[in-house]
Amino acid sequence: TRAVGYRDNSVAQMARRGRLDRVSHGVYRIPFMPGGQLGPYMEAALWPVGVRGVLSHETALDLWEVSDVNPAKIHITVPCAHRTQRKAPTSYVVHREDLDAGEISEIEGVPVATLERAIRDCAADGVGLDLIEQAVRNGRGRGLLTAEQAAALTSGFGLDRVATQRA
């Protein structure tokens, strides 16, 4: 808050006066501004205090709109070293992994794992092969994956025929 010219207690005062809505610890929004469809996802990315979470796994597949995956919870990846005293909301699944900068993208300002990374994470977590195949095929068809990426993703799952197809 100091970096933008506010005193430490200014945000709390604005929240008490109704000028800001407190979403969670350290996360506020302007009440008269629409949160948008991605609002809950940005809240999840901001939940881990001190670092920015990255939406990952099934949540990332859902945001990339490449498969019919329908995650029951929001998956967030934080660095391995990140620790917090706060318990994660029950609507979140927190994964600990040190992602490289090249494995992180953004969708409308929301940090999200790249499609390639999301597919790898989902496959490792046991997401159905039909959803993995659909994600690779649609990702390739939309230009979100190169032929090489698609081939590498599918070779270990017996889905080699998908890598060469462009939907």
Question: Locations of the language-model features?
Answer:
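Short gly/ser-rich loop at a beta-strand->alpha-helix junction or flexible surface loop bordering the NTP-binding
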Residues: 2-167
